Amino acid sequence: MNIQALLSEKVSQAMIAAGAPADCEPQVRQSAKVQFGDYQANGMMAVAKKLGMAPRQLAEQVLTHLDLSGIASKVEIAGPGFINIFLEPAFLAEQVQQALASERLGVSQPTRQTIVVDYSAPNVAKEMHVGHLRSTIIGDAAVRTLEFLGHHVIRANHVGDWGTQFGMLIAWLEKQQQENAGDMALADLEGFYRDAKKHYDEDEAFAERARNYVVKLQSGDTYFREMWRKLVDITMTQNQITYDRLNVTLTRDDVMGESLYNPMLPGIVADLKAKGLAVESEGATVVFLDEFKNKEGDPMGVIIQKKDGGYLYTTTDIACAKYRYETLHADRVLYYIDSRQHQHLMQAWTIVRKAGYVPDSVPLEHHMFGMMLGKDGKPFKTRAGGTVKLADLLDEALERARRLVAEKNPDMSADELEKLANAVGIGAVKYADLSKNRTTDYIFDWDNMLAFEGNTAPYMQYAYTRVLSVFRKADIDEQALASAPVIISEDREAQLAARLLQFEETLTVVAREGTPHVMCAYLYDVAGLFSGFYEHCPILSAENDAVRNSRLKLAQLTAKTLKLGLDTLGIETVERM
């Protein structure tokens, strides 16, 4: 149930009846403060201006046409023309009953779309590092949310699996007589990469051989293709371990590397030339875009093929967007790539639109994100100034969480302790990131993320176990509760119920904007409201069975909402902490 959508429809009809245009926006929002009701319609200002009347006068006329019987207990005009809506307790009670009767907690399903989500995108022959964390976990939270809403989601792991470095790596492996690359661990490959690069820079004969190997690889030579495939396989096997540790839904089947688009590139360059979009300039093939200017104020040239015939990332990204529309039949494409790539993507997509490869009706959305910073406000590094490997970060998270939970649970079995430490440690790293607005940089701080107070994973996981403990203490049969009515008579009951019923609205925002922090803020709010409700509205010692059962049902919906909400974020819940 989307109460915001229901009220928007009702207010919109009343506005039209009061003389507003048919496309008027009621601007129904969740109220920021309790005294302004549960919802507020703010659309009178803009519409009244068009109609040449005072907003308050329009609001008064709208109220004469607004029928919210059975939904609102009170509707009032505030300030210059805001309409405050207070929900009817009986309506809240009925919606809570319906949410509990549904596995989906009453969340409706929008029109099903095919949505391609591009995220994670590590490089072959390199271990994943902290720079891959944000794309991987924010993208996965978006995927989980979209899938829960019923969309057909195609995960696209745009792996960097092509380029001159492969000639270099294969040449170096050969030189070291390590052709059986399948037996190597990725840590070896990292060392090989460094050594190969050093030789490539210092040994011209080696560099020449590496360049020849690239040509052979690109021409489809069987031996070189096999060596390349081994490098890719080793990398993705290692990355899968990281994905599984992170509780991320990516698998090998989701890999759509840069190499996938190679066969398309010559045709795209030829087509862009034929369409008059690409021209020869100083030996290269270039698309000049009026939408982007260089320092001199002239249209910026975007190279799609170099003098030597090589292609660029832009060419691949043009092919990639085309493929996602034509072959994957995407209705919408989301890219979780850091903000530094924004202009590059905008240029590629401008060419895509001009060439007619993807119609304007199919959104291409760059859901960019900021950087992960250390406490000093600089990019997060090791003490020695190197890049932090993702596996090392997760190891440290697990170790810190292990100490934390062992201290709080001295009698817990080793197995249970390990499971709990894993849920808390990995959850803490993910939640610390997901709870921040993705568009901003954020400070990585172990102490904050592992705290049991504030908007953190440990606090949210504990809040969930606290609700469950109510049922454990009372030894209640949840099935027997099903027929008991919900009675909303206290303000704290109403506030908790109203917020719980905004779960669908929250999911809708996350799905539309790709902003998991909105879900984190919502769940944190729910946990806080439950805490106040638990303190002031006795559950197990309620004055009678009817009130006790009703409050148990509110607790039940709280637990289900917290669990499902955390699941859309990829955060594991535990039964006890």
From Swiss-Prot:
One of its GO terms (biological process) is arginyl-tRNA aminoacylation. One of its GO terms (molecular function) is arginine-tRNA ligase activity. Its EC number is 6.1.1.19. It is found in: Cytoplasm. Keywords: Aminoacyl-tRNA synthetase, ATP-binding, Cytoplasm, Ligase, Nucleotide-binding, Protein biosynthesis. A motif ('HIGH' region) lies at residues 122-132. It catalyses: tRNA(Arg) + L-arginine + ATP = L-arginyl-tRNA(Arg) + AMP + diphosphate. Signal peptide: none annotated. Transmembrane segments: none annotated. The keyword Zinc does not apply. The keyword Acetylation does not apply. SUPFAM superfamilies: Anticodon-binding domain of a subclass of class I aminoacyl-tRNA synthetases, Arginyl-tRNA synthetase (ArgRS), N-terminal 'additional' domain, Nucleotidylyl transferase. Disulfide bonds: none annotated. It is an enzyme of class 6 (ligase). One of its GO terms (cellular component) is cytoplasm. NCBIfam families: argS. Monomer. Belongs to the class-I aminoacyl-tRNA synthetase family. This is Arginine--tRNA ligase. The lineage of its organism: Bacteria, Pseudomonadati, Pseudomonadota, Gammaproteobacteria, Enterobacterales. The gene is argS.
